[in-house]
Amino acid sequence: MVTAALKRFWSGGHGEAGGEAGGATTVAVKPGLWTRLSTWAGALLRDYAEACGDAAAAARARPGRAALYVGLLGGAAACCALAPSEAAFEEALLDASGSLLLLAPATRNRHSEAFLQRLLWLRGRGRLRHVNLGFCSLVYEAPFDAQASLYQARCRYLQPRWVDFPGRILDVGFVGRWWILQNRMHDCDINDDEFLHLPAHLRVVAPHQLHSEANERLFEEKYKPIILTDDQVDQALWEEQVLQKERKDRLALSEADSLVQSDVSR
């Protein structure tokens, strides 16, 4: 549309110049600059109006395709607007680090802790890089600090190859979230090493076992009072008497040993 309007603008000027050269008796007045600009602007607006009219007619003819295109454009615009920045990654990293510090070392997930420690180590050495790709953002590992003046850091022939770039990606930011960091922090308070001493069938709990009737029954039974029979009460009393007698015997033996040692020292 813009090209057609420009052609009209310049062709009008050249046509008038040719008319002056062809006819000796005809006197043509060349329009001024503002007149030509107004003509060109009017032609441009008419072209845009025709294009908008054609687009509206096509949308009325095929509303499904038009809605799909509008949805795709709106989704692309939303992704570009919600692509997280480098400050958002710093905030998410510090938040995850604070959440992990609140847990006891024995209950921390080893994979979550190792991934977070690596990110913090790279951040402390200035080797984290952030790039915004429009629809999403990437955080990747750099071999050196951005301010390093070493020969290996400045020589372009020693830079990492592009084929190795996928292995250097640490996180992907999309629609306002850092997905790899969020995935690694899932169940960060569950340490699988704590359950290694259990039998194999007790290390993994199936989803249907979490709300089973057996679990519900055991949960209710733990609040019930313990009822002991007479035999159990007599057995408990007898065991208590035996324990008290053993304590008295040990105490008497310890006192006798102390007296013997004091006599020997004299």
Swiss-Prot record:
Mitochondrial intermembrane compartment residues: 84-266
Localization, UniProt: Mitochondrion inner membrane
Keywords of this entry: Membrane, Mitochondrion, Mitochondrion inner membrane, Protein transport, Transit peptide, Translocation, Transmembrane, Transmembrane helix, Transport
TM helices/strands, residue ranges: 66-83
GO cellular component: mitochondrial inner membrane; mitochondrial intermembrane space; TIM22 mitochondrial import inner membrane insertion complex
GO biological process: protein insertion into mitochondrial inner membrane
Topology, Mitochondrial matrix side: 38-65
Domain of life: Eukaryota
Subunit comment: Component of the TIM22 complex, which core is composed of TIMM22, associated with TIMM10 (TIMM10A and/or TIMM10B), TIMM9, AGK and TIMM29. Interacts with TIMM10B; the interaction is direct. Interacts with TOMM40; linking the TIM22 complex to the TOM complex. Interacts with TIMM22 (when oxidized); the interaction is direct.
Protein name as it appears in the record: Mitochondrial import inner membrane translocase subunit Tim29
Organism of this sequence: Mus musculus
Recorded name of the encoding gene: Timm29
